[in-house]
Swiss-Prot record:
PANTHER family: GLUTAMATE--TRNA LIGASE, GLUTAMATE--TRNA LIGASE, MITOCHONDRIAL-RELATED. The keyword Chloroplast does not apply. ATP binds at residue 241. This is Glutamate--tRNA ligase 2.
């Protein structure tokens, strides 16, 4: 048997983080078994479905690095097929027309509520002859669900789950306007797409019982279900926007790398021993549903950020530069020159050691692409206001101005010689040097910075600082 999974989001908003994890688990399960991962857009809610949301879903899945097989299926386009199945069930006596009005149904629910009874449709038209039907009256089509016994689902995550059939009513398959309901569309599409495993959030578990009954009524093989626990916030409450229930695109914009997000989402509910850092290749090899827990996972933004820092430190410098350039151009409002981009690429090794997100990296890299005279932050300006610091900086400028090889080693050696000659520690030389070159009290190793900037730019920034540059707004070169 070829394993076939699917991810089936509704295009009524962004691809949220829980949906991203569901897509990942389906993708991993399919790839682990050498099967297929399909994508279906459940756009039957025409009032809320938008083209922009569809594109956001596509973009989010692609950004996560999840490829799907074949063309994405648009559910609304298959409405005729869904209705066809309902009519076939009518012909076979497995479904029936219900002529109850909304007022009648409301009255039934209110009576049940008053008596403390479960609010379920009582099957009024289930066995009534067609001759009782009001002439020309609108009707819905309902499934004639089993009234006795129980429905049992062997769930790969939750174990055996069961419900007494008298707890389920006869669900609507076709509305009064002839359009299919979500429950009908899902079952027909999963069958026609050959889905073997339905992996989704456990908030769909109650739907599974009704869908199971519909599969049986149609005489189709029921797929294997796996309902994964939802993601909660750090406080144990259902994940919301205040916890970080944002769209996948928001995490991209906050500067997270897709490989870090994949790793983090994987560990939200799935484990492989004590392994925390898991590559995508390892995840494909190791992923099984046996290792998915039954308890909700808690979203930890700090842990995600630290994990992202790990992946940034190990990422290719050229790739990080490509991601960084548009962020810096957005910050500065100017296109970066080829020289600035080359400078970023050369200095990336030092830059990425400190940053945990691409946004942090962009903030820390601004000084590399800033135009002269360089803006100084408050601490750097205070340093340059100190006469001893400026004297040390001026002396260092003289020391390196005619230096032969402009490398971090020769530049550091020159600073050490000067510090020793002036009876100071190296930090006393490095502090004003960092202020002049980076406009800040924090930067990558300062002699590495000088090597990246080059002789002309470094000496020019030192001259600017000694000339009394004050804090302004930096712009890109």
């Amino acid at each position: 048997m070829t394993v076939v999974t699917r991810f089936a989001p509704s295009p009524t908003g962004f691809l949220h983080i829980g949906g991203g994890r569901t897509a990942l688990f389906n993708w991993l399960f399919a790839r682990h078994h050498g099967g297929k991962f399909l994508l279906r857009i459940e756009d039957t809610d025409r009032a809320r479905s938008t083209d922009a949301a569809v594109e956001a879903i596509f973009d989010g899945i692609k950004w996560l690095g999840l490829d799907w097989d074949g063309e994405a299926v648009m559910q609304f386009a298959r409405a005729c097929r869904h209705a066809e199945v309902a009519r076939q069930l009518l012909d076979e006596g497995k479904a029936y027309r219900c002529y109850c009005t909304q007022d009648e149904l409301t009255a039934i629910r209110e009576e049940q509520k008053a008596k403390g009874q479960p609010m379920r449709y009582p099957g009024i038209w289930r066995d009534r002859p067609a001759t009782d039907a009001p002439e020309g009256a609108p009707f819905v089509v309902r499934l004639k669900a089993p009234a006795e016994g129980e429905t049992i689902i062997a769930d790969l995550v939750q174990g055996d789950v069961r419900v007494a059939n008298d707890q389920l009513d006869d669900m609507v398959l076709l509305r009064a306007d002839g359009t299919p309901t979500y429950m009908l569309s899902v079952v027909v599409d999963d069958h026609d797409m050959g889905i073997t495993h339905v992996i989704r959030g456990d908030d769909h578990l109650t739907n599974a019982f009704r869908q199971y009954q519909l599969y049986k009524a149609c005489g189709w093989e029921v797929p294997t279900f796996a309902h994964i626990p939802l993601i909660h916030g750090p406080d144990g409450a259902k994940l919301s926007k205040r916890h970080g229930a944002l769209g996948v695109d928001a995490y991209r914009d906050m500067g997270f790398l897709p490989e870090a997000m994949r790793n983090y989402l994987l560990r939200l509910g799935w484990s492989h021993g004590d392994d925390e850092i898991i590559s995508t290749e390892q995840a494909v090899e190791w992923f099984t549903l046996d290792s998915v827990g039954r308890s909700p996972s808690r979203f930890d933004f700090v842990k995600l950020t630290n994990l992202n820092g790990h992946y940034m430190r190990g990422a290719d410098d050229g790739r990080l530069t490509e991601v960084l350039v548009p962020l810096l151009e957005a910050k500065t409002g100017k296109a970066l020159s080829g020289e600035s981009v080359a400078r970023l690429r050369t200095g990336m090794t030092g830059l990425k050691e400190r940053a945990k997100t691409m946004v942090e990296l962009a903030d820390s890299a601004l000084f590399y692409v800033a135009e002269r005279p360089l803006a100084l932050d408050e601490k750097a300006a205070k340093t340059m206001a100190d006469e001893t610091a400026t004297a040390d900086l001026a002396a260092y400028r003289t020391e390196v101005k005619e230096l032969g090889a402009w490398t971090r080693d020769t530049l550091e050696d020159a600073a050490r010689r000067l510090a020793e000659a002036r009876g100071q520690k190296l930090g006393k030389i490095a502090q004003p040097l960092r202020a002049a070159l980076a406009g800040s009290s924090v930067s990558p190793p300062i002699f590495e910075v000088m090597e990246v900037l080059g002789r002309e730019e470094s000496l020019g920034r030192i001259e600017d600082a000694l000339g009394g540059t004050r804090p302004t707004t930096s712009t890109a070169a």
